[in-house]
Amino acid sequence: MHVKKYLLKGLHRLQKGPGYTYKELLVWYCDNTNTHGPKRIICEGPKKKAMWFVLTLLFTSLVCWQWGLFIKTYLNWEVSVSLSIGFKTMDFPAVTICNASPFQYSKVQHLLKDLDELMEAVLGRILGPELSQVNDTRALNLSIWHHTPLVFINEQNPHHPVVLDLFEDNFNGSASNSPAPGRPCSAHRCKVAMRLCSHNGTTCTFRNFSSATQAVTEWYTLQATNIFAQVPNQELVAMGYPAERLILACLFGAEPCNYRNFTPIFHPDYGNCYIFNWGMTEKALPSANPGTEFGLKLILDMGQEDYVPFLTSTAGARLMLHEQRSYPFIKEEGIYAMAGMETSIGVLVDKLQRKGEPYSQCTKNGSDVPIQNLYSNYNTTYSIQACIRSCFQEHMIRECGCGHYLYPLPHKRKYCNNQEFPDWAHCYSALRISLAQRETCIYACKESCNDTQYKMTISMAVWPSEASEDWIFHVLSQERDQSSNITLSRKGIVKLNIYFQEFNYRTIEESAANNIVWLLSNLGGQFGFWMGGSVLCLIEFGEIIIDFVWITIIKLVALAKSVRQKRAQARYEGPPPTVAELVEAHTNFGFQPDLATPGPDVEAYPHEQNPPIPGTPPPNYDSLRLQPLDVIESDSEGDAI
């Protein structure tokens, strides 16, 4: 009962409002606030009132402007970068090594036979019959050529360039199975380009090159991709360089190692690659001390005599240092080690720690990235390189209907080839140079919040020396179980030394440049400096704002009621009926005080012996006041609410 009574009092007080007008509320605020300035507006003379009003308004605007700047700076989510240097025993990085040639030519020659003959013929047409040593009488398999031919573009007239197929006998486009001598255009007068057409031939583009060397290399790689995409992965692995042939000697610190300590992985660009200290099945190996003697020492045989002649023009080893359990993107982030040289690589470690949302768009494990990570089949950690390549493969499958050979495939998808997807090269070329595709992938992919970078200092020396090369190559040859009359040579041997320069590591860490404490301190400092205010002054200002809103709502409600009453009165003409008239109409239907005749109308009741006796009318009150049983107490009793 007491709760109900209290709630009724509270409701009544809400309906009444603060009980002030706008002017009274402003005067009360200026007289009671602790902020400097408003009190002087109501206490001084007219001139000083105007002066203090202008000053108060000016400094209030200045404070609001400063607050806006600080809040905008805070919402920019800026970071500050701190650099710290630590010293501890560190895990040795994972080391991936590959041969520059992905396959042994002796094992893939049967797959590339037609392509190699066609390549020799192409070189003959480019060089001209006087410089070519190719037998031009051989018949060529031009089925590969027709998908993506190379052409001469004669630009002597820039407004009307002439396009000629390398194997056309005339300008009409007829072709023969063997190259015709005496071409009217040669490499020094014409540019070599690659013609890429859609399957129906309605759309063709030309990919130009500044050198014929680049043109034929890109063309051969594209055709080889078509061939290798149709070969099962197990056969491709068998065609690459085995670990026991590639790795001749291994030493980590004071402990010997061999090819069994390396994890094999197939890379489409470099064939069989091998990773030392990947950490997939065992704990990462630590380095006992900095220096060459405590690092990894390798002697590698590149087998340059078995390189694919037109596919690989670089001789040496490709290597990369990376974190444990991370996929090696060795084509983009690796370095070459030259054959016939001893390459020493000193390593320094940088650890990057980025702030997450909302300070940056980094991700901890890639779970919030909307791109399917195609490299997750390797059980590796997330990286932005994996995301970008997965995104490209996703676009490739959506636009071209097949996946590119260089990237992993999603489930139940096929690699592109000329037989099943005749226009894949045209589609791939357009997608490769598409700016929209690159921007989409860069926008969708995120950097990793925690990353480790290995800074390398590289030095090289000739190895072995002339005085020692004879016995070193003979010993290494015998250890490879080769006959004594077949020795290794300087052209195929690489020696590597990989070690920590020092155990000092740098940690580059991002932290919030402006936190909530910084924001509150600056807001309070500006408010206190310009207006002498505090948090309590803000609460006072909030209170008066609430009262203003409260009074406004009450006035709007009262105005709505007044408008509604005026509309209701406009429906009736004349003055409203009195209470006595309303009671007469509802209690005695036979009584008509003003309109009825003085006596009963006998004609109105022809069948009645006696007309009905009129009822006694009620008192003719002009008003009727009803007092409810439960009298609500006066407002003065509820002022304590």
UniProtKB/Swiss-Prot annotation:
InterPro entries per the UniProt record, alphabetical: ENaC (IPR001873), ENaC_chordates (IPR004724), ENaC_CS (IPR020903)
Modification after translation (UniProt): Ubiquitinated. Can be ubiquitinated at multiple sites and undergo monoubiquitination and polyubiquitination. Ubiquitination by NEDD4 or NEDD4L inhibits the ENaC channel through endocytosis, intracellular retention and degradation of its individual subunits. However, some studies could not confirm the ubiquitination of this subunit of the ENaC.
GO terms of molecular function: ligand-gated sodium channel activity
One Pfam family hit: ASC
Membrane-topology annotation of the record: Multi-pass membrane protein
Glycosylation positions in this chain: N141, N379
GO aspect biological process, one term: sodium ion transmembrane transport
Catalytic activity: Na(+)(in) = Na(+)(out)
PY motif, short sequence motif: residues: 617-621
Regulation acting on activity, per entry: Originally identified and characterized by its inhibition by the diuretic drug amiloride.
TM annotation in the entry: 51-71, 534-554
Compartmental location: Apical cell membrane; Cytoplasmic vesicle membrane
The organism's place on the tree of life at top rank: Eukaryota
Extracellular side: 72-533
Segments on the Cytoplasmic side according to the record's topology features: 1-50, 555-641
Disulfide bridge map: C98-C273, C185-C190, C197-C204, C250-C257, C362-C449, C387-C445, C391-C441, C400-C427, C402-C416
Alphabetically ordered keywords of this record: Cell membrane, Cytoplasmic vesicle, Disulfide bond, Glycoprotein, Ion channel, Ion transport, Membrane, Phosphoprotein, Sodium, Sodium channel, Sodium transport, Transmembrane, Transmembrane helix, Transport, Ubl conjugation
GO CC terms of this entry: apical plasma membrane; cytoplasmic vesicle membrane; plasma membrane; sodium channel complex
Main location: membrane
Quaternary structure and partners: Component of the heterotrimeric epithelial sodium channel (ENaC) composed of an alpha/SCNN1A, a beta/SCNN1B and a gamma/SCNN1G subunit. An additional delta/SCNN1D subunit can replace the alpha/SCNN1A subunit to form an alternative channel with specific properties. Interacts with WWP1 (via WW domains). Interacts with WWP2 (via WW domains); inhibits the channel. Interacts with the full-length immature form of PCSK9 (pro-PCSK9). Interacts (N-glycosylated) with BPIFA1; the interaction is direct and inhibits the proteolytic processing of SCNN1A and SCNN1G and the activation of ENaC.
NCBIfam families linked to this entry: ENaC (TIGR00859)
PANTHER family in alphabetical order: AMILORIDE-SENSITIVE SODIUM CHANNEL SUBUNIT BETA (PTHR11690:SF18), AMILORIDE-SENSITIVE SODIUM CHANNEL-RELATED (PTHR11690)
Name under which the protein is recorded: Epithelial sodium channel subunit beta
Gene of this entry: SCNN1B
